[in-house]
């Protein structure tokens, strides 16, 4: 008799975990609203460009080739975004960029419904690594991890954000 009770308890536990997990994902997704070329993050009160720098929002997706930029080149990209899109675009901080990481996503650790065609590579943040000031923090969308080991002359991808 005990043999049959263990699988039933395990099945109940699995069902509860699945419900909790699906509710967590729905809560996470409900914090974001898509608006074409940008995504509103209600939790952080910021707006993300849907596409990485170099790509354009066209045909309801990000098209083109994303650009890897050295840190010095980012200021020009921000100036162009401000001129073309209006607002005060900037690099996200580490916490903001980590917030759009999707640990449960398979290939690219980001919700591709919100951010289509995102490269599964590192993206710049605006933060210097305080322990090693010659290095900047990045967030890697292949692993979903944050790394503070990139010097400014190594090119990485860029996704811009602005305050709401």
Tell what function each PLM region has.
Residues 2-14:
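Bacterial N-terminal signal peptides that target proteins for export
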Residues 45-48, 124-125, 160:
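Bulky hydrophobic/aromatic "packing anchor" residues in well-ordered structure
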Residues 33-35:
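Short, small/polar residue-rich loop motifs at catalytic or cofactor-binding pockets
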Residues 12-22:
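Bacterial N-terminal signal peptides
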Residues 151-164:
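Short, structured beta-strand segments at or near domain termini in extracellular proteins/domains
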């Amino acid at each position: 008799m005990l043999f049959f009770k263990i699988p039933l308890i395990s099945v109940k536990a699995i069902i509860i975990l699945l419900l909790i997990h699906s509710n967590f994902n729905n809560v996470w997704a409900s914090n974001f609203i898509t608006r074409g070329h940008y995504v509103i993050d209600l939790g952080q009160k910021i707006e993300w460009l849907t596409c990485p720098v170099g790509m354009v929002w066209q045909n309801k997706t990000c098209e083109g080739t994303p650009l890897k930029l050295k840190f010095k080149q980012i200021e020009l990209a921000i100036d162009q975004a401000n001129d073309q899109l209006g607002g005060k675009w900037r690099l996200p901080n580490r916490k903001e960029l980590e917030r759009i990481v999707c640990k449960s996503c398979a290939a690219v650790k980001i919700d591709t419904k919100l951010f289509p065609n995102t490269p599964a590579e590192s993206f710049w943040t605006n933060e210097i690594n305080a322990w090693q000031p010659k290095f900047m923090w990045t967030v890697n969308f292949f692993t979903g991890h944050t790394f503070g080991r990139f010097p400014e002359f190594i090119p990485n991808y860029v996704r811009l954000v602005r305050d709401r």
